[in-house]
Amino acid sequence: MKKVELVFIPSPGAGHHLPTLQFVKRLIDRNDRISITILAIQSYFPTTLSSYTKSIAASEPRIRFIDVPQPQDRPPQEMYKSRAQIFSLYIESHVPSVKKIITNLVSSSANSSDSIRVAALVVDLFCVSMIDVAKELNIPSYLFLTSNAGYLAFMLHLPILHEKNQIAVEESDPDWSIPGIVHPVPPRVLPAALTDGRLSAYIKLASRFRETRGIIVNTFVELETHAITLFSNDDRVPPVYPVGPVIDLDDGQEHSNLDQAQRDKIIKWLDDQPQKSVVFLCFGSMGSFGAEQVKEIAVGLEQSGQRFLWSLRMPSPKGIVPSDCSNLEEVLPDGFLERTNGKKGLICGWAPQVEILAHSATGGFLSHCGWNSILESLWHGVPIATWPMYAEQQLNAFRMVRELGMALEMRLDYKAGSADVVGADEIEKAVVGVMEKDSEVRKKVEEMGKMARKAVKDGGSSFASVGRFIEDVIGQN
C-alpha cells in the first residue's frame, strides 16, 4: 500500500507549535503509512522551541523538520497594526519559499521508488495564505485550529457579518449572536484586535477557512457539543474533526533550555504541601504585569490565606517574550517574601505548567485562559479563575464561565497593556473562590476531565475523529 506524507505548516510560537507536534505524533502512532514533514517558519519574535523540535526529529524517524528560509526584506514591526497582522503578513512573505519546498517534495515523491505521496497540506490559523500553494500543486489543504470550536464559530461568522456590513465592535454595541456559541457575546469579550478597530487581518484569515477540505480542531465533542453539532449540519462548512485534547503531557521535558534545578525546586515544594491546597498563577508565554499590578496580586494572595505558586514574569520590550524577574524585592510589597516565600507560597519564573497542574497539591489555577491551558486544567481536573489577556482569551473566558460553567469569573474583559489594575480584594475573592473544595465548578471540571481522557482512547469521540481524518487523507491516495 502507498505511504503518504502530510506537510504541516504551524504558526511560530509555543501555543501553535506544541499542539501541532503532539497531533502529528498521534497521527504516526495511529497509522504506519503516514510520515510527517513540518515546515518551520522562524518566529518574528524570539522563541525557545528549536531544541524541542530537534529532539522530536531525533526520536521520531517519520517526523522531519525543514526550515523555511527567511525572506530577504522583512518589513519592520512598526508597519503592522496588530499582532495578527504581524503573523499573517510575515508568514505570507514566506509563500515563495514554501512553494519551492513543497514543489520539490512533490517532485521527489513522484520520482521515488518508495511510493510516498504528498497527500495533504495542513496549515495553521495564521498560515492560510499557504492554501494557494496547495491549490497550485493540486494538493488538498486542511486547517489545524489549535483553539476551540467556539472560536471557529466566531471566525466563520466574521466574513458573513463583514459582507453584510454588520460588524459592531464598540463596547456599547449590542451583543453578537454567533451560530455555534450558546449565549450572545458582548463586544467587550471579543478579541482585542477587533475592538481596537484592527479588523482587516482577522477577516482576511477567516475568509479562507471554507476553502479547505477539512478543519481539525483541538477540542472534543463532549466539551463543545453545541458548536460541533451545528458544524456537522451545515453544508457550507468543511468537515470538522474534533481531535482533542491535544496537549503536551510531557510538559516539554525534552526542552534542553528548561532549568531542571528550577523544576526540581518547584516539585519538591509542592510535594510538601497538602492535597489541593495550592493555587497556581500562570499567564502564558506572553503574559506579564507591571509593578503596580504585581503588588496588587501579592497583597491579594496574602489576604486570601491560601498557599500559592506564582509564575511571575515581567514585561520586556515590545515584541519580546516576557522575562523572569531578576529582583523580586523591587516589585513585591515590603516584607512579602519574608512572610510567604517557601512557607505559604513560592514565586518562580518559568514553571512546568502541566506537571504542576497534574500534582495532587494543586487545587486551583488563576489563568490567562489560553486554550492549551484550559485543556490542561480540564484534563487534570483543576478549576480556573479567569484573567484573560490577549488574542481570543476573553472569548474563551466568557464561554468557560457563562456557557460551560467550568470556570470562576474574576475578569472576562481584561486586556494586556490596558491601564486597568485589578485590585487586591478582587484577586483575593477569586483565589478563595477557585480553591473552594466542593464547588459546582470543581465538580464539573473534574467530570469533564474524565470525559477528556475517554475521548482520546480507543472508542472515544476524538479517537474516532482522528480515524476519520486519516481515512479522508489516505482515501485520496
From Swiss-Prot:
Transmembrane segments: none annotated. One of its GO terms (molecular function) is UDP-glucosyltransferase activity. UDP-alpha-D-glucose binds at residues 285, 350-351, 368-376, 390-393. SUPFAM superfamilies: UDP-Glycosyltransferase/glycogen phosphorylase. Its EC number is 2.4.1.-. Pfam families: UDPGT. Optimum temperature is 40 degrees Celsius. Optimum pH is 6.75. Keywords: Glycosyltransferase, Transferase. It comes from the Eukaryota. InterPro entries: UDP-glycosyltransf_plant (IPR050481), UDP_glucos_trans (IPR002213), UDP_glycos_trans_CS (IPR035595). Coiled coil: none annotated. Belongs to the UDP-glycosyltransferase family. Glycosyltransferase that possesses chalcone and flavonol 2'-O-glycosyltransferase activity. Converts phloretin to phlorizin (phloretin 2'-O-glucoside), a potent antioxidant. Possesses glycosyltransferase activity toward quercetin, isoliquiritigenin, butein and caffeic acid. This is UDP-glycosyltransferase 71K1. It comes from Malus domestica (Apple). The gene is UGT71K1.
